[in-house]
Amino acid sequence: MITNRFAITALLLLFALPVTADCPRVPGKEDDRRANAGCLIIQDSKVLLLTHRWGGKLGLPGGTLEAGELAQCTAWRETREEAGLTVTVGERLAVMTNGFHVYRCYPQAPMDTSQAVPVPRSGMTEVSAIGWYELSSLNKEGWRFYYQFEQFLEVAGKAMQSGTAKSQDSASDEPPEK
């Protein structure tokens, strides 16, 4: 009986501890929200999208928040697990109709948008392919959450037109300066 009470008390105290961000974030763009989240990665006027193994539909790298995790760290972790990419997480761009938070993310290594990205071992259960797509090549029927396809296009289009999606001659897309 005492052991069960101790375990329950320990768990409650663990979840009550303050959250620390255990992921790289753009200085000045830190966000303390907790939510399911993902990354919008833009380079050379293309977006990085995953083909989900079950259903074959496209979507952003991202997923479900873990206990005590910040939304920006959820986006970072899920992108690392599903796409094998280490990113720096920037500003929150949108909250989708299903509550999913979309963050602007920047790869920490140069990316070649003319090549598919290999699916990492950690992503193989959920992801069948990773690639770069122009927005004009996408359609609602091929989008995982079809009911928010137009919202995604609007968010990605605005990000491409803003200073957060600067196109560069090099293969890297650096986070904005503070």
Positions of predicted regions on the chain:
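A short gly/proline-enriched turn/hairpin at secondary-structure junctions
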Residues: 58-63
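Acidic, metal-coordinating catalytic segment for phosphate/diphosphate chemistry
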Residues: 20-38
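Unchanged
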Residues: 65-88, 95-148, 176-178
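Entry beta-strands of beta-propeller and related beta-repeat scaffolds
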Residues: 46-47
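Bacterial N-terminal signal peptides that target proteins for export
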Residues: 1-8
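N-terminal signal peptide c-region/cleavage motif recognized by signal peptidases
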Residues: 16-18
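Charged phosphate-binding loop/patch that engages nucleotide di/tri-phosphates or the phosphate backbone
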Residues: 147-178
